[in-house]
Amino acid sequence: MSKTYLITLTPIDKFFFGGEITFTRDFKNKDKESRALSDEEKDLRKFDEEFSSYVVRSNLFPQQTSLLGMLRFLLLSNSGEKIFKNNKIQDADGAKGLIGEKSFQIEPNDFGEMDFGKIKNLSPCFLRRKTTGDWENIFYAPFDKDLNVKFEKGNILLDVGKSQVPDISYKEPKNGSEVTFNQKDGIESLYFGNNSILKEKDIFLEDTRIGIDRNFEGKTQDGAFYKQISYRLTNKRKISKDKYEDHKLQFALKVEVDDDCTLPQKSIVSIGGDNSQFSLESKHIENTKPDELFPVITGELFCSGKVVLISDAFIDEVDLSNCMFAINDTVPFRFLKSDLTTQDYYKFSGKSKLLRSEKKFLYTRGSVFYFETEEQITAFEKALKAKSRLYQIGYNYYKTIKQ
């Protein structure tokens, strides 16, 4: 038996959700005598060369693996000192029953579900918005929102060598005339609910920090300049030239846990690369199908059906072979690995350290895949669900729209 909670996360201040790019580190010998770099320092330097910069920008949403880590830590920190004390596990067996033996990991060709103890599954993270009435669920809009994607005879994707782009157009807002879409113009990032359409700037406000690192003697270090772009959630949006609408925003997700597991109603939790703090509230709710949270999608459909990603998704290339056409984007995916022996969650060197996963790429939420037949849609849905380990923590969620 299990039960479902709605968890809301309200930022206490600005937040920073770490991405693929991190700040550089200085590996120069601090001693006067030079020495060779250790193997661990060489590995970190290699990582810096590929993924470091003096300018870093937060992701807009927390990674699902970070939310899972937050929940696992929340259960541990509320388990009592016999199991968890001074941020260290005291009883490995007790901890295993609560949170499982390992954090999220992907093994080669193994996408079966993992054991996370009392935690059964997570939904994708989404936004909730409130003006004067009830809270409204807000999701990233499909990339083809307000676009007409028309497949005419002879314009269907048969294979990669014979592929043709369908006719894509949109209605001009001012006069309603149909205009051919030019991909050079790009696609605006939109968010929508059943009653709202929001631009990115209506939700997220940049908070930029620029500085120079200095050593303990007050001297500027080499490569010390940095620029960090964090975000805040807005408290209003502009609806006309001189008119604003007040609103409240928060992150949210559904979590299914064992029936004997009780989440705290309120807590302060940390998420992200800078341990950004959030006010967590949990509420017991009735379980619903994943796509029932997603707003209704309207508009004409010029093929048998399409699949819209509600969350980022891991999709094998072979599973895209029957797709007529797609409007999509990808994002790097990397996560931190730990187990019950991990003692230091802030270092990547030494004993009992955190480990970085290999980099993979996910198709981003909002991506749209078009199909000619219902059989092709069913096969694609099956492929998404087959990655049950990812689905378990909020990836590979989708909404299917058919004629």
What are these regions (language model features)?
Residues M1-Q403:
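Conserved active-site/ligand-binding neighborhood in enzyme cores
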